Each structure stands twice: as structure tokens, then as C-alpha cells.
């Protein structure tokens, strides 16, 4: 069950006209273009096909341009994922183990890069449509174009111009819902968190992409 916590860090498809698709893409990319960095807390819930809660988690995160991110799950147990834009570290404190691997540039494999990568790459990686628009609250649906993505679809919601939540659905219908809390945009990033030096005695597992 632990692997569910770090899904960074899941309704029938609606058909959109080419004009609507283009508008949604331009609108989302315009929002992402203003984000140089983002940090805050998160609440994460994993749901099965029937909507039953399988797991809940709380933590904090930060992402920044250059494909850099830091994602710390604090409860129910501590796990951390970080990237300096080249390397990813996934650390399990209880197991005293860290997995080290190259960062995949595939946004379908690394959802955190939606906010930390180049906005233009988002349009290349996803088919984008506007799923819901309530004025101050807008939800975009992103469907991966690549092969073997981590998820089948990703809904990202903005409220008052800020990212508010993400909902990922996999091929089995399992959903991961992430609500962002107390966001700070474009300020206050601790760049040292994007690199991880394992504590002495940690088992280091090197993986190739």
C-alpha cells in the first residue's frame, strides 16, 4: 500500500470541437506560464472503483521550473520523493532505503512536472480539454498521448487563479485525489530540498530508466 502514497506525486470521455480544444490548451498553458514555483501542503485520498477510501495521506511539497520537485508524505508514515531536474530520489524512512533513478521527462510518468516543467511540453504530452468551468473554478482534463502512462487521465482544477486540486485515474478505475493547501506561488522555495543526501546506513538502490 505504501506505493500509493507517492503517485505524483481516474468518467466517460466528452467530445470537444477543435476550437474548444485549442481554447482549453491555450488557457491552461497561460496559467502554467505564470508559475515559476509553488509550495504548500496537500491532502491525498486514494479511492477504488466504487469510490471507497483505500488510503489517506498528508504532507507538504514544493515544485519549481527546471523539473525540480520535493514531495514529503508525513502521515500515516514518512516517505519522500525529490528531484533536482536530473535525478529522482525516493526515500522510505521506515525501511531506511532510497531508490535513485534518472528523472523521466515523460509527463505521463511524472505528474509533478505539470507544474515544474515547461508549459509547452504539456501540450506535447497531453490532449487537453475543459471539463468544467464555473467562472472562478475551472477544471481541465489531460489525457496522456504517450505509451504506458502512469495514469489514464488527469483532472487539474484552478480556483481563483491558483491550482486547487489534481485527480488521477488509472486503467483499473482507481483514483488518487490531491487537494493543495496554503499555497505560496513564485516565492519562498528552498532549493536545497531538491537534492537528497541519504542518512548514514541507508540502503541505496540504483535504478536505470
UniProtKB/Swiss-Prot annotation:
Gene Ontology terms: biological process: lipoprotein localization to outer membrane; lipoprotein transport
Recite the UniProt keywords alphabetically.
Chaperone, Periplasm, Protein transport, Signal, Transport
Which Gene Ontology terms of cellular component type are present? outer membrane-bounded periplasmic space
Pfam families for this protein: LolA
The compartments listed are: Periplasm
- Check the record and name the InterPro entries matching this protein: LolA/LolB/LppX, OM_lipoprot_carrier_LolA-like, OM_lipoprot_carrier_LolA_Pbac
Q: Which domain of life is it from?
A: Bacteria
Annotated signal sequence range: 1-22
Keyword Ion transport in annotation = no
Where does the protein principally reside? periplasm
Q: What family is reported?
A: Belongs to the LolA family.
Which NCBIfam families does this chain map to? lolA (TIGR00547)
- Give the multimer and partner information: Monomer.
Cited function: Participates in the translocation of lipoproteins from the inner membrane to the outer membrane. Only forms a complex with a lipoprotein if the residue after the N-terminal Cys is not an aspartate (The Asp acts as a targeting signal to indicate that the lipoprotein should stay in the inner membrane).
Protein name per the record: Outer-membrane lipoprotein carrier protein
Underlying gene: lolA
Amino acid at each position: 500500500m505504501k506505493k500509493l502514497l507517492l503517485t505524483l506525486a481516474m468518467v466517460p470521455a466528452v467530445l470537444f470541437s477543435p476550437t474548444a480544444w485549442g481554447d482549453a490548451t491555450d488557457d491552461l498553458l497561460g496559467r502554467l506560464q505564470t508559475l515559476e514555483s509553488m509550495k504548500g501542503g496537500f491532502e491525498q485520498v486514494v479511492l477504488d472503483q466504487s469510490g471507497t477510501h483505500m488510503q489517506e495521506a498528508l504532507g507538504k511539497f514544493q515544485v519549481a521550473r527546471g523539473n525540480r520537485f520535493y514531495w514529503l508524505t508525513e502521515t500515516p508514515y514518512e516517505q519522500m520523493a525529490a528531484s533536482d531536474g536530473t535525478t529522482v530520489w525516493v526515500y522510505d524512512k521506515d525501511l531506511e532505503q532510497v531508490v535513485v533513478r534518472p528523472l523521466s521527462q515523460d509527463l505521463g510518468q511524472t505528474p509533478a512536472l505539470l507544474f515544474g516543467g515547461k508549459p509547452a511540453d504539456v501540450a506535447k504530452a497531453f490532449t487537453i480539454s475543459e471539463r468544467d468551468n464555473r467562472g472562478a473554478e475551472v477544471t481541465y482534463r489531460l489525457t496522456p498521448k504517450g505509451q504506458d502512462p502512469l495514469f489514464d487521465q488527469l483532472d487539474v482544477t484552478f480556483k481563483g487563479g491558483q491550482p486547487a486540486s489534481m485527480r488521477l485515474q488509472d486503467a483499473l478505475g482507481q483514483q488518487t485525489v490531491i487537494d493543495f493547501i496554503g499555497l505560496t506561488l513564485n516565492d519562498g522555495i528552498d532549493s536545497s530540498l531538491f537534492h537528497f543526501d541519504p542518512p548514514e546506513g541507508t540502503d541505496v538502490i540504483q535504478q536505470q530508466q
